[in-house]
């Protein structure tokens, strides 16, 4: 244990709970916070508290929101027959930045991962099935990560939803813009070939 005062040690410990923050970074952040002026510290405290107390999952799509239903679910200009299925709320934000998708979302809150003990029953699939059957969904765009777990989840969704007459599509994956072909792995190249489009 360090010779720092107990409040600083507690702050370092609390900051190290955050993903990607090791002991040294937590220590640097703690000392930065201690040296900040009171207004900024109070703003940080309020932002942390509000994020924890006032942000919750939308009862329709499970996206993070501060009103229910969320603004995307309330937006009548969006195509309510089209749902993009994502792993978590950060994926919704990433897709929204592109400003190309005009449907609605459904956040699974994870992917099927037997290694981590996560099966279909651990995902938010019942609510998705209720939406498909109750809202007249015609297409499901599966936008899970291009990982073994993401692919397994996409295949499971396809098997689950296809019998209901819903079109199931998957985002195309492949080479990134500006990427060098020689550095691409085999799976990326394979998916790039499979997802090729006519010019």
From Swiss-Prot:
A zinc finger (C4-type) spans 58-73. Keywords: DNA damage, DNA recombination, DNA repair, Metal-binding, Zinc, Zinc-finger. PROSITE patterns: RECR, TOPRIM. One of its GO terms (molecular function) is DNA binding. Residues 81-176 form the Toprim domain. SUPFAM superfamilies: Recombination protein RecR (SSF111304). InterPro entries: DNA_Rcmb_RecR (IPR000093), Rcmb_RecR (IPR023627), Rcmb_RecR_Znf (IPR015967), TOPRIM_dom (IPR006171), TOPRIM_RecR (IPR034137). GO terms for biological process: DNA recombination; DNA repair. May play a role in DNA repair. It seems to be involved in an RecBC-independent recombinational process of DNA repair. It may act with RecF and RecO. NCBIfam families: recR. Belongs to the RecR family. This is Recombination protein RecR. It comes from Natranaerobius thermophilus (strain ATCC BAA-1301 / DSM 18059 / JW/NM-WN-LF).
């Amino acid at each position: 244990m360090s010779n720092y005062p107990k409040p600083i040690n507690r702050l370092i410990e609390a900051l190290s709970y955050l993903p990607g923050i090791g002991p040294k970074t937590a220590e640097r952040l703690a000392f930065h916070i201690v040296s900040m002026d009171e207004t900024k510290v109070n703003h940080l405290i309020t932002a942390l508290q509000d994020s924890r107390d006032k942000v919750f999952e939308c009862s329709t799509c499970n996206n993070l929101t501060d009103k229910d239903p969320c603004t995307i679910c309330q937006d009548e200009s969006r195509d309510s027959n089209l749902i993009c299925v994502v792993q978590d709320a950060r994926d919704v934000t990433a897709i929204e930045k592109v400003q190309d998708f005009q449907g609605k979302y459904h956040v699974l809150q994870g992917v099927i991962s037997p290694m981590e003990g996560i099966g279909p029953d651990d995902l938010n699939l019942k609510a998705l099935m209720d939406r498909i059957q109750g809202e007249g969904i015609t297409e499901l765009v599966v936008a899970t990560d291009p990982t073994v777990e993401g692919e397994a989840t996409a295949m499971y969704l396809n098997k689950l939803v296809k019998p209901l007459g819903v079109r199931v599509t998957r985002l195309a994956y492949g080479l990134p813009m500006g990427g060098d072909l020689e550095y691409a792995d085999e799976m990326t190249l394979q998916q790039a070939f499979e997802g090729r489009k006519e010019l």
